[in-house]
């Protein structure tokens, strides 16, 4: 099985082409084996490239534990760079079908290489039934006791569920494990620990549902900026600093724009 390994701000993925649906139904098993950091290649998840009649291309995301993910911000940047530079879709504006619908992506090209990727991530959704969360009112600075800690949480759907915690002092990232599985969230939640530096800068650390601590999470960065803006903590153009680097998130009338890059690590053959 041919593959490429890529990363977006340290959030790493294995990209495989399945243009003839050869691996349909085997995605979870493939992801668990390939993503294992001792017995496999090692990654936070896999990105599967598939044809689609209604779009330029389709992206399927599987987490390292074999679970399906509707959307991944860092993953879609890697995916867009891959399909352009591998010659699968040679367009600087492309529509990618994801589990969260079609995402329009604008590529900045220099010497036939993708320099910057601008993704319209759509809008955040605070409706509890859509997150989903087992409550009637929006989760805005809700006080909860989870595990051994007390937190104020804000939750929304950004393609996948995200819970935001604004911290004055750093919580251990492992707190995310208990919050991910908190009874309020029947399907679990990603957890983002945020610190506002100024009105145009934030730091974000993410515990990713199904993957654990990660160096970056694109949907989490977008969700964090949306939550911070809703609470009046930041403006609409924000630089987000994560352990693996930084990117820009802009809140615009037609959706939230995530602007960053992605990198190839290696190509290879996996003996599946």
Swiss-Prot record:
UniProt-listed Enzyme Commission number(s): 5.1.1.7
Molecular function per GO: diaminopimelate epimerase activity
Q: GO biological process: what's one of them?
A: lysine biosynthetic process via diaminopimelate
Where does the chain bind substrate? 11, 63, 73-74, 190, 208-209, 218-219
Its main subcellular localisation, reduced to a broad class, is: cytoplasm
Q: Which family is it part of?
A: Belongs to the diaminopimelate epimerase family.
Q: What is this protein called?
A: Diaminopimelate epimerase
């Amino acid at each position: 099985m041919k593959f490429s390994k890529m990363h977006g701000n340290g959030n790493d993925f294995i990209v495989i082409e399945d243009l003839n649906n050869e691996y349909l139904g085997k995605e979870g098993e493939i992801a668990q084996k390939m993503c294992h950091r001792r017995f496999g290649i090692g990654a936070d998840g896999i990105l599967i490239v598939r044809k689609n009649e209604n779009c330029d291309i389709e992206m399927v995301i599987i987490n390292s534990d074999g679970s399906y993910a509707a959307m991944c911000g860092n993953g879609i940047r890697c995916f867009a760079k891959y399909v352009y530079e591998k010659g699968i879709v040679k367009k600087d504006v492309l529509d990618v079908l994801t589990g969260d619908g079609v995402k329009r992506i604008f590529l900045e090209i220099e010497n036939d290489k993708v320099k910057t990727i601008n993704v319209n991530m759509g809008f955040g959704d605070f409706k509890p039934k859509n997150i989903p969360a087992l409550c009637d009112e929006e989760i805005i600075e809700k006080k909860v006791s989870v595990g051994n800690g007390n937190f104020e949480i804000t939750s929304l759907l950004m393609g996948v569920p995200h819970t935001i915690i604004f911290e004055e002092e750093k919580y251990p990232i492992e707190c995310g494990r208990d919050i991910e599985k908190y009874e309020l969230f029947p399907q679990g939640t990603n957890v983002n620990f945020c610190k506002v530096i100024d009105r145009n800068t934030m730091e974000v650390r993410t515990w990713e549902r199904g993957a654990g601590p990660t160096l970056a999470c694109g949907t989490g960065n977008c969700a964090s900026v949306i939550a911070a803006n809703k609470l009046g903590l930041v403006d609409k153009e924000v630089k987000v600093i994560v352990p693996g680097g930084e990117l820009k998130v802009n809140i615009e009338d037609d959706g939230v724009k995530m602007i960053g890059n992605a990198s190839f690590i290696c190509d290879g053959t996996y003996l599946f």
